[in-house]
């Protein structure tokens, strides 16, 4: 179900527009679909038809502005956001969808994702003519190639090919068996232009990608938030990941 865009009062609009001003250039562009912030002072933008996201320096986008923006968006959506409630899923007055994650559910910085509301009315034929489905590749060929590498016992080639083909990889082993070491080695094979989001209880994953965001599950001790891995998985899917890395799987996630 799509929620109705909130209607902000004049005073609320003044504050909201002020905090959104650093993003105004991209909010106004028809070809921009995603506006992302992983940490202060930088903005990532995705445009229609572009294979890679753009990185822009944004010195005015500091921690204070991001926190104020989060509180203002929460206010106009009749929500609250704080260290005890650090996840915010909301809508801007123009219809753009917003997901924000605040500490302690991040590695220290406020994270922001704005997905602009863009709904095209087209026929099924037009959809397949214009869609990116043909670029997905032949999964049967991928499976055959991976099977051949295993048959040849080329395990290095197998893992490199599996990462390149964006296969789902599950690493399992006993305590101190090198699971995290292997995971960090696999992450180095991910192309730098891809967006990586990690979810962990304790930050151990080394995020080498330029466009990377680390989210942290919180157990709720000492008055902090109760944010589960499952909560963060749902939030991360609204933050445009190319790759989603989960440190430990224990239950419903």
Residue ranges and their predicted role:
Residues 54-64, 75-164:
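P-loop NTP-binding catalytic core
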Residues 148, 152, 156, 160-161, ...:
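Switch/coupling sub-region of P-loop NTPases
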Residues 41-42, 61, 104-107, 118-120, ...:
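Conserved nucleotide-binding/hydrolysis micro-motifs of P-loop NTPases
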Residues 1-94:
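N-terminal accessory targeting/assembly segments
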Residues 34-36, 44, 89-91, 97-101, ...:
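Structured core elements
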Residues 179:
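Conserved lysine of the Walker
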Residues 176:
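Walker A (P-loop) phosphate-binding loop of P-loop NTPases
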């Amino acid at each position: 179900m799509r929620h109705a865009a909130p209607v902000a009062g004049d005073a609320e609009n003044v504050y909201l527009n002020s905090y959104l001003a650093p993003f105004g250039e991209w909010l106004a562009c028809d070809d921009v679909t995603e506006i992302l912030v992983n940490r202060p002072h930088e903005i990532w933008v995705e445009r229609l038809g572009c294979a890679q996201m753009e990185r822009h320096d944004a010195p005015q986008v500091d921690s204070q502005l991001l926190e104020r923006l989060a509180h203002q968006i929460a206010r106009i959506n009749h929500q609250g956001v704080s260290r005890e409630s650090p996840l915010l899923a909301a809508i801007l007055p123009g219809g753009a969808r917003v997901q924000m994650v605040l500490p302690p559910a991040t590695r220290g910085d406020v994270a922001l994702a704005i997905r602009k509301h863009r709904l095209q009315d087209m026929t099924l034929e037009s959809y397949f003519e214009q869609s990116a489905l043909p670029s997905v590749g032949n999964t049967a060929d991928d499976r055959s190639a991976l099977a051949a590498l295993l048959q040849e016992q080329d395990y290095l080639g197998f893992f490199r090919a599996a990462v390149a083909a964006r296969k789902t990889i599950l690493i399992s082993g006993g305590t101190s068996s090198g699971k995290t070491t292997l995971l960090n080695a696999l992450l180095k094979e991910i192309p730098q232009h891809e967006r990586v989001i990690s979810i962990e209880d304790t930050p151990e994953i080394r995020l080498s990608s330029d466009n990377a965001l680390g989210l942290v599950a919180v157990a709720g001790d000492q008055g902090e938030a109760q944010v589960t891995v499952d909560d963060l998985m749902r939030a991360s899917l609204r933050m445009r990941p190319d790759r989603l890395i989960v440190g430990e799987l224990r239950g419903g996630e």
